[in-house]
Amino acid sequence: MKLGVNIDHVAVLREARKVNDPDILNALYVATQNGADQITIHLREDRRHIQDADAYAIMKYSNVGVNLECSINRAILDIVTDLKPHRTTLVPEKREEVTTEGGLDVVGHEDEIAYAIELLHDYLIPVSLFIDPTIEAVEKSKELGAEMVELHTGAFANLYAMLSSSLPHSNHSIKELELPRHELSIRLEKSILAIDEAAKHAKKIGLEVAAGHGLNYHNVHEMMKIAEITELNIGQSIVARSIFSGLGEAVKEMKRLTSR
């Protein structure tokens, strides 16, 4: 399994005080020295964490592939085509969201996504689409010309957390998931099945398959059971763990959990 370490949240901490501490390049170095197979960053339109200068520096100094996440905004795409990352993952984006809330609407925004893919391909940049784990979204991704899909695991992660963590007893409990445990268990199994079926179908029609969003040290084993998934992109949980263990140890432990 290929482990993509998302270092956005290192930049979140830096931007909280508008200083160069922690240094994003230090995070890049430590992550790659301790098992990261890929570095993932999200260059958002609102620049809430990763800045343009970060993206250019990471592209310059990374000795592993860089997976750059971005929206289909033309101004952002112009920067991406200049950066020429090893891969671009197109993601949905809303300014008011705390984090990416769902997969790309590959049907509703078909023309805009097709244009973005064509533009990136003109610069020889492979494209992945961040999609909800449905057969329809997988098939549309193939039709649009993407080489890869990243299956959005957020719904799975939320259900897992409400069943198996202290989340229900915190201020961040997910109100719509405050359900009896047996109902949560049924929904969790359905979410895992949806990811499994989407991954198998994607592989069958010639797409590479990644997964990400909300994956952590407690739930990642479920994704490891799906052979068609060959890449996981994980960020917040690694950076959160690093507060207590150090970034190097946090990356090493996740690499151990995601090794086949």
From Swiss-Prot:
The annotated site for Transition state stabilizer falls at E150
Q: Does the keyword Transferase apply?
A: yes
Gene3D superfamilies reported in the protein's UniProt record: Aldolase class I
Annotated GO biological process? pyridoxine biosynthetic process
Could you tell me the EC number(s) of this protein? Answer: 2.6.99.2
Entry binding sites for 1-deoxy-D-xylulose 5-phosphate: D8, H9, R44, H49, T99
Subcellular localization, as worded in the UniProt entry? Cytoplasm
Reaction equation(s) it catalyzes: 3-amino-2-oxopropyl phosphate + 1-deoxy-D-xylulose 5-phosphate = pyridoxine 5'-phosphate + phosphate + 2 H2O + H(+)
Q: Where does 3-amino-2-oxopropyl phosphate bind?
A: N6, R17, G214, G235, Q236
InterPro entries assigned to the protein according to its UniProt record, in alphabetical order: Aldolase_TIM (IPR013785), PyrdxlP_synth_PdxJ (IPR004569), Pyridoxine-5'_phos_synth (IPR036130)
Active-site residues, as the UniProt record annotates them? H42 (proton acceptor), E69 (proton acceptor), H213 (proton donor)
* Listed pathway(s): Cofactor biosynthesis; pyridoxine 5'-phosphate biosynthesis; pyridoxine 5'-phosphate from D-erythrose 4-phosphate: step 5/5
Q: Which UniProt keywords apply?
A: Cytoplasm, Pyridoxine biosynthesis, Transferase
What Pfam families does the entry give?
PdxJ
Record has Methyltransferase as a keyword? no
List the GO molecular function terms.
Answer: pyridoxine 5'-phosphate synthase activity
Q: Name one GO cellular component term.
A: cytosol
| Biological role | Catalyzes the complicated ring closure reaction between the two acyclic compounds 1-deoxy-D-xylulose-5-phosphate (DXP) and 3-amino-2-oxopropyl phosphate (1-amino-acetone-3-phosphate or AAP) to form pyridoxine 5'-phosphate (PNP) and inorganic phosphate.
Tell me which family the UniProt entry assigns to this protein: Belongs to the PNP synthase family.
What do we know about how this protein assembles, alone or with others? Answer: Homooctamer; tetramer of dimers.
* Protein name (database record): Pyridoxine 5'-phosphate synthase
Organism name: Sulfurimonas denitrificans (strain ATCC 33889 / DSM 1251) (Thiomicrospira denitrificans (strain ATCC 33889 / DSM 1251))
Per UniProt, what is the name of the gene that codes for the protein in this document?
pdxJ
